[in-house]
Amino acid sequence: IHATAHAVCVVLAAFGYWVAAPISLAFTTSGGVLGALYLRKRATGASRLAATHISRWLIVSVYVAAGLCYATIITH
């Protein structure tokens, strides 16, 4: 799902919809965080993802940053 959304945002950004660029960054960053947590889970043999609540807050902060980028783009 992350890859599809990322691809759509990249295509939209290529066609001049510049608001898609920060959203694409948000998808990429959240996917990277989830991937890192999954690898940590696999390496330690844990039964669930460690620090899931921290990863949720990281993902939320990335989306907030994307929203702030959008607000900056449309006001300038």
Swiss-Prot record:
Membrane spanning residue stretches: 7-27, 54-74
Subcellular location: Membrane
Top-level taxon: Viruses
Keyword Cell membrane attributed: no
Cellular component GO terms, alphabetical: membrane
Keywords: Membrane, Transmembrane, Transmembrane helix
Annotated membrane topology: Multi-pass membrane protein
UniProt entry tagged with the keyword S-adenosyl-L-methionine: no
Recorded family membership: Belongs to the alphaherpesvirinae HHV-1 UL43 family.
Entry protein name: Membrane protein UL43 homolog
Organism the protein comes from: Equine herpesvirus 4 (strain 1942)
Taxonomic lineage: Viruses, Duplodnaviria, Heunggongvirae, Peploviricota, Herviviricetes
